[in-house]
Each structure stands twice: as structure tokens, then as C-alpha cells.
């Protein structure tokens, strides 16, 4: 890869190794080397710029969870030397809540949850990042209700009028023009496009979308640390979530995919859902509050459709 250290054989190797170096080798200061100057890190909580706040947050997380492991389940990627590279890195995390931190007094509980990080890379650096963490899974394992956790965050920041506004469609983009990520040109027929069309059908409430496109034995990893098996449970998950936002707009934000010999075809989609909480579903009775959902989904395809799916959004931010 042009501009990258020769010790990295490809983009997945680069992503997996720098993640291990930063977190498990505890070389936190190497973030200053691997993160480009002024780069944005966007998450449901908001956006931060540059390496310094990432370094600070990493130290804080490692203090609270000193034995944290980041097991890279997959890196779905696209790109080339001319247009740059993009990775969607799905991580299964294990950690012990050992010290005081953002989740309160230490409980000694052992946690497991997923994170997906979408990174644009060039010249041995990450220069754009979108990150979604399964906060619902974390707080549930700490015996905290996600809605109550969200309420406490708001109160701790001084109430609704003073608290940090989550990332939304109006969040300013303060990235310099030379740091803006432009997706590489991809073919019109690939597994990423196919998955994007399936998600569009689901969010358009097409009744046969899941039956037509999912394997009967589908396993779906859901936000909150839940798992669904079979088309019926997958249908229930999507319907319950979507019914909370019947007047919202669903948008495909980014597509990446991997189609390699001797591997399942895989796709990664970053998507958004924008609109009022105007229906009854996953988030209780309608409040008509404006909502922005930052979601990332991964899928593996087999001969009978999607056989494994991972859906991630931060339900605590929605609450």
C-alpha cells in the first residue's frame, strides 16, 4: 500500500495491528502518530477533532477497564492507492469494570460488547473516523437501564438546556477541505449495493424483504447485546425499531464490501435515520422528539441470502 509502512501487508493488517498496539500494548501515545492532524472522530455522542481528545479518552477507558481486549472480528474494506482506503472494523470487546470512571463506581463485572469503527486511511494514518459503541450492552451488564443511564447523563451535564447535543444532521463539519473523505468509485453491482438495497426495502416496510433476502437460519447480533435467530426474530427486531420512527428518513451514508476467494461475501453499511419519535416501538410511547440515529450494519452472505448480520446503534443516545 502506497504511503504505508511495509510491515503492514494490507489494510486489515494495518487496522488490526494499530488497534492492538494502542489498546492492548497500551501504546496510547502512538495515536499521535496514527491519527492525522485535526481529523474528525464522529460518534453518536458528537464529534471531536485531532489526536489529543482521543488520547485523553483512551487513557480514561483503560483506567476504568485496564484489561480491555479488542478482538477484531472482521475488517470489511474498499479502496486503492490512488483514492485511499476505507475500513469498517467490527470489534468484540471484553473488559472488567475495575475502576471508577464514566460508568460509576467499580463493580468488578466482566463485560462483553461490540464496537464498529469506520476509518478512512492514507499515508499510514487514519484521517476520518465514524465510531459506534454498543452502550446499551455495556450499561445493561452493569445493571443500569439504558433510559435511566441517558437521563442521568443529561442531569449530570446540567439538564436538557445545558447538556451536550448528540451528533445529528446539523452538526457542523469543521474538517479542512484536504481532510474530507471522498468514497472511492465502486461498481454498480456488488454485495455492498445489494445489502444497501435490502436495508432500504426493510426501512420502506416491504413485507417480503426479510423472507426474500435472509437465510432461514439467520443469526442477527442486535444492539443491547441481544441475539436474534431465524427470520421471525429478525423481523420482530426491525419492525419494533422502525415502528418507533414511522415518519423518519432512512439514508445510506456509506457502502463498503469484501468479495474474496474462499470467504463469504461481506458488506458494511453506515446509515442514518432522521425524524421524530412519532410511533410506539422500541423506545416506548411516542414523544415527537427529533431523533438522529447513527447506525452501522455488517452482513455475511451465503447461498440462501444473509446468514449473519450485526446491527449497531447507541440506544442510550436515542433515549
Task: Describe the function of each predicted region.
Residues 1-319:
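C-terminal and inter-domain tail/linker signature
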